[in-house]
Amino acid sequence: MTKDEIISTECSMFPDMLKKSNFLISSVYRATLLENKVLALALTKVNLNEEGRPVATLKTREIKQVLHVTGNAMSTYLKDVATSLAGRTMFVESEDGSFQCMNLVGVVSYQSGTGTMEIKFEPEIKDYIFDLKANFTMLDIPMMLSFRSGWSYRLYELLSSKAYHSKYDKDTSNVFHIKYGVSELKLHLGTVQIKDDKGKINRDIQRELEKKEIDYDYIVNELVHEKLKSFDKWCDFKRRVLDVAVKEINEKSDLHVEYNLLRGGRGGKIYGIDFEVTRQDV
């Protein structure tokens, strides 16, 4: 049996495709690769309980098989994922300046006797899981699970959600330009956190996020504490985050990604990134 056949067999216990709300994709948060993968698996098995609350039940043996977790490490992984999921706050801003800030998951529990992990989503999230009409992106589960970098996973989600809703243009050879400011991208990828160690968002950051025109540079450079930043220098961010993600996306996904740097001001400071994304499935 080939490596691809093994992966296909392992993933057969879950649907091949996930219809994921762009609300969940575009929200600002930081998560580990394992957490993102467990969340993706949970979203394929979520149902409404008797109280009308979204609940997903996962077998730990399935998680171990699909995510290749071995030995006694599973218990530690589950605790870390549960703690992170239960504390995740979703912040999303729409184009008109409206925003929503809410918790994603209320309770995560594990029963050792049955070997099951139950994830209870907050009731307010229901509309962003079920009955999605247009504001969603189809994600290939086996392909998403193949990513080895959390940066690849998140950047793929972000770029795919934009390209998925872009119209095909034969004059541009199906190349879509997706632009992000550097600070904005850092927030979306999670190299900059807006929550402190206690899970709180600074009031000044909250006020800035409530504005119709958000100044991401001001948030990242002035309001976020240094200890909440990773790969702050551009050279580190480019080498250890951006280039790693683009390389893996090009190797494993249905997107081909290149990018150009946007410069301005004195000395040609880099302020943004123009991604050239080609959907190879169109």
Features from the language model and the residues they span:
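Charged, alpha-helix-forming regions
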Residues: 1-282
